[in-house]
């Protein structure tokens, strides 16, 4: 499978987020691999694809032009902003996606460290009825 085929099956289109595309072919391939190798469930893959895309577009909208320039403060600000409009489980899912994606990029040696590692998510507990 070529990167283009993998990307098209992942995103329903041939476009990578600009921060990923601008970081070079190796980073782009690791990004596609993250979704195709790590996530087997199609629904989870789609949700994580949206979450990663939303975060990367959010970064671009704040003037971040280099993937390696993303810092924990950026991830924390994004999560805090999401908490104003999304449910706690959705926010936790976005943070889980961002953490896993950056872990994958660190493992592939395209990122020096994971900027989401130290960011805490919202508290959420499910209570059962009696």
Residue ranges and their predicted role:
Residues 1-18, 101:
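N-terminal helical hairpins
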Residues 17-20, 108:
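Short N-terminal helix-initiation segments at or just after the protein's N-terminus
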Residues 19-33:
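Short alpha-helical hairpin
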Residues 29-46, 53-129:
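N-terminal core-binding DNA-recognition domain of tyrosine recombinases/integrases
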